[in-house]
């Protein structure tokens, strides 16, 4: 049987695997509105940890927040959010930050030499940040950044540049535990886990620098990953954030509820047999 027989024509496409909120909205993909959680996030700790398994929408959630808070997307607010919850109930902080987004899952390189990968990834990201906000930062920022070596030192320089310009930053880190999960999956490298997350480890040093930014130009920070293990071991290095992964009020922020799935199936007129839920069988 043709799978298309299960779908009524002229319906919105499903954004499977997509993480670009602007494209989803601009090209009218099906989108489950989770923006009601934005005011709740603002009421929570300024430094927000959230752990969920893979394929739960973590990256898309961060992308939504980036578009909401970025000063560069102010003129697109109505197009992106106008008919969503947050478009009808905007907060005072919308489109008010310089946004720095780091995705550690995109770092390539050999496991035993990940520091070069981290440095390279951060260097490119930091330079793009300087170009994106060139008119809001001191004019020498990009050229001076190029003279600084290493992710930790470059991040420190960005703090100084933002502080000199009187700008506040919203830092997003996606898959913060990418390195350590890779280390833990390799029995030959297990000893390196302690080396990197304790003492003078490079990853620990990086998160210590993130912590330092919270006293200067980082106004808010949102960090996601798939495991709490690394976070626990880095806690003393980044001990001002709050883990909201098990907080009931945020349970529905990522992933789909049963009601949302049923609504989606109804929208697509799926003629699929679904076994009754325990509630229906009572």
Feature names for model-found ranges:
Residues 3-69, 73, 78-87:
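Walker A/P-loop-proximal flanking segment of P-loop NTPase domains
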Residues 80-127:
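P-loop NTPase motor core
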Residues 158, 162, 192-218:
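Substrate-engagement module of ASCE P-loop NTPases
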Residues 167-190:
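Conserved P-loop NTPase "ATPase switch" module shared by AAA+ and STAND
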Residues 172, 220-226:
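Structural recognition of the conserved hydrophobic beta-strand(s) that form the central parallel beta-sheet
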Residues 230-244:
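Short regulatory helix/loop adjacent to the ATP-binding pocket of P-loop NTPases
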Residues 250-272:
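Conserved small helical "lid"/interfacial subdomain of P-loop NTPases
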Residues 273-282:
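Single conserved hydrophobic/aromatic residue that forms the stacking wall/gate
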């Amino acid at each position: 049987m043709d799978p298309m027989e299960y779908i009524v024509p002229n319906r919105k496409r499903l954004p499977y695997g997509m993480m670009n909120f602007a494209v989803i909205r601009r090209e009218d993909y099906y989108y489950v509105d989770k923006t009601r959680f934005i005011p709740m996030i603002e009421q929570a700790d300024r430094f927000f940890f959230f752990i969920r398994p893979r394929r739960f929408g973590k990256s898309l959630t961060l992308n939504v927040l980036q578009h909401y808070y970025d000063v560069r997307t102010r003129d697109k607010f109505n197009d992106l959010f106008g008919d969503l919850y947050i478009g009808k109930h905007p907060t005072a902080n919308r489109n008010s930050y310089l946004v720095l987004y780091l995705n550690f899952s995109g770092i390539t390189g050999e496991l035993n030499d990940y520091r070069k990968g981290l440095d390279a990834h951060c260097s490119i990201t930091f330079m793009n940040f300087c170009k994106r906000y060139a008119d809001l930062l001191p004019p020498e920022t990009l050229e001076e950044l190029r003279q600084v070596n290493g992710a930790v030192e470059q991040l420190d320089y960005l703090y100084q540049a933002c502080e000199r310009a009187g700008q506040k930053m919203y830092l997003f880190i996606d898959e913060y535990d990418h390195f350590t999960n890779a280390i833990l999956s390799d029995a030959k490298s297990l000893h390196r886990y302690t080396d990197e997350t304790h003492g003078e480890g490079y990853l620990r040093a990086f998160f210590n620098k993130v912590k330092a930014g919270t006293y200067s130009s980082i106004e808010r920070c949102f960090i996601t990953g798939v495991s709490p293990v690394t976070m626990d071991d880095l806690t003393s290095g980044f001990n001002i954030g709050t883990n909201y992964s098990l907080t009931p009020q945020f349970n529905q922020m990522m992933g789909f509820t049963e009601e949302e799935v049923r609504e989606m199936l109804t929208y697509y007129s799926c003629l699929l047999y679904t076994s009754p839920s325990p509630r229906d069988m009572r």
